[in-house]
Amino acid sequence: WNGASVWGGIFAPTIRYHEGVFYMITTNVTDKGNFLVHTTDPAGEWSDPIPIKQGGIDPSLYFEDGKCYLVSNPDNYITLCQINPKTGEQLTESKRIWIGTGGRFPEGPHIYKKDNWYYLLISEGGTEYGHKITIARSRYIDGPYEQNPANPILTHINRNMQSSPIQGVGHADIIQAPDESWWTVFLAFRPQSDMHHLLGRETLLAPVRWDKNAWPVINGDGSVSLEMDVPTLPQQPFATKPVRTNFKNGKLGLEWVHVRNPHPENYTFD
């Protein structure tokens, strides 16, 4: 990966857990293809990459009744098919199930099932200042999908940098915590002077509730802030990161994982 473009490498990995196995699926943008890997121990060895036929970016998996569904966005349509997650074989024809609400680049799809509804969550607008999260639902996994009349359910399109330091919110996933509370994780950036955001895309967390019409509502009004009231989660202090690493146990910590090959001139070993 030396010399790889900033637009290269892998995009938008999604991890799912099913029947004792962790699956991670993603897009290799450099080689123009999707693949998945799996393991029973996410801190251990993973399988070799398994190529996936259906194109597009931001693939995601959904498991139900012994079937594995793949959703991605070839040709800017959210598209569904069944696959064999162990071999990557595509078992059904790809079917277009939603094109979004009209924003450009409908992508980042995820499917969930709650109270006999299939929910399809996507991002639109591109990972820039027009980014937004929209959602649709259906009684059937392959549609037809009806969109939420309150879309977008999260965006900062209408908030400038003076009113909100968080911009470009999108590419979300929804999870349920062990205490049955609901949450969304998503990306955003924090621009500084001249609209530069040197930290790049950051990961944020916000609470979710379900309204009387069974649609998800993010942080009460579809916007987020740097500090949000989340009383259901206990405080989790972060341990101080070591400035010196001892290699006696033969294992490297996660801080040694790099997006690309490290620059050896930045490190000293003695």
Regions found by a protein language model. Give the residues of each.
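Carbohydrate-active catalytic/glycan-binding domains of CAZyme proteins
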Residues: 1-270
